[in-house]
Regions:
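Enzymes that bind and transform nitrogen-containing heteroaromatic metabolites
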Residues: 1-177
Length: 177
């Protein structure tokens, strides 16, 4: 069982700019659509866990639904799944550990944890096992940080670090417990 973060950050650790935009993710050309690890991640996982804000961002992209696995969305305000996504998106509520235990019981053991607030909440509860962080060579100077305050330090071990697309540094970390 593993809870996995797969995310891009700026050099200064932001996942969105000051306006909450992700345009900077297009700053590195990828004309041949070379995969940077997303395809193997999607093959590995059983499902995704994200918050409502991240779901809204994904829906705003105006493209085909990017996930082939079930998406579990934490939301205190959402009462129903957007029309057309009832077989793809499932609402969850409750304590993280309880929701995870329920998902694991249902066979969802390898989970992709996505979205700033959701990742921070999982880290606060020490529920992240692996992180793949891709750093873009740009300083945003502010915005939504990937990491927030923690009760205690969490140690991770570098498993792999490589340059992708000739300019992005992608590092895989595994939690040391």
């Amino acid at each position: 069982m593993a809870n996995i973060v797969f995310i891009a950050t700026s050099l200064d650790g932001y996942i969105a700019d000051k306006q909450g935009k992700l345009d900077w993710l297009q700053s590195v050309p990828n004309p041949d659509n070379i995969d940077t690890g997303f395809v193997p991640l999607m093959e590995r996982i059983d499902g995704l866990v994200m918050g409502r804000n991240t779901l809204d961002v994904v829906l705003s992209f105006g493209c085909d639904w990017p996930y082939s696995k079930p998406v579990f969305v934490f939301s205190n305000t959402m009462t129903e799944v957007p029309q057309g996504y009832e077989d793809k998106v499932f609402l969850v509520k409750g304590e993280l550990k309880d929701v995870l235990a329920d998902l694991n019981t249902k066979g969802f053991n390898e989970l992709y944890i996505d979205g700033g607030v959701t990742i921070k909440n999982f880290l606060k509860e020490d529920l992240i096992d692996e992180m793949v962080i891709t750093r873009f060579p740009i300083l945003l100077g502010g915005g939504a940080p990937l990491f927030g305050d923690l009760e205690q330090p969490l140690n991770f071990k570098v498993m792999k670090s490589e340059v992708v697309l000739g300019t992005l540094v992608q590092t895989t970390y595994v939690r040391e417990r």
